[in-house]
Design a protein with these regions (language model features):
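Conserved N-terminal/central alpha/beta ligand/cofactor-binding core
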Residues: 37-120
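A generic short-segment signal for beta-strand/edge and adjacent turn/coil regions
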Residues: 1, 17-21, 48, 90
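N-terminal Rossmann-like FAD-binding beta1-loop-alpha1 element of flavoenzymes
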Residues: 5-31
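A short, basic/flexible loop-to-alpha-helix module at the beginning of a structural domain
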Residues: 1-4, 111
Length: 120
């Protein structure tokens, strides 16, 4: 069997889906997964998505992420992840993701290695 496609995305979690959504609409995209959609890390994650709540949160978010990664994380990548988190959440809301809310505002929780509530 021969499959013709413009782009192959390995992974069907949030990262793979977000990558596909950000490609030009005229591209033929093939997404592959090692088993089924419910086995992706995104589907199995205990909570949600981390987001920088405000600039005062940056240092503790950075430290929490580095500590969770046993300080083996690439610092530049952690910085990009944190600084782009608000824009990505905005994009996900525009795509229709319905995050939990409390009193009309996003409801942040504290989970895992995070020292402050920053999980949606």
């Amino acid at each position: 069997m021969e499959i013709k496609t413009d782009v192959v995305i390995v992974g069907t979690g949030v990262g793979g889906a977000f990558s596909a959504l950000n490609l030009p609409e005229d591209k033929q995209i093939l997404m592959i997964t090692k088993s089924d959609l419910e086995s992706s890390d995104s589907f199995l994650a205990q909570g949600g998505i981390c987001v920088l709540r405000d600039e005062k949160d940056y240092d503790s978010y950075f430290e929490d992420t580095m500590r969770a990664g046993h300080y083996e994380n690439r610092k530049e990548s952690v910085d990009i992840m944190i600084r782009s988190s608000q824009e990505i959440i905005h994009d996900l809301i525009e795509y229709g993701v319905d995050f939990a809310k409390k009193d009309g505002n996003l409801a942040f929780t504290r989970e895992g290695a995070h020292s402050r509530p920053r999980i949606l």
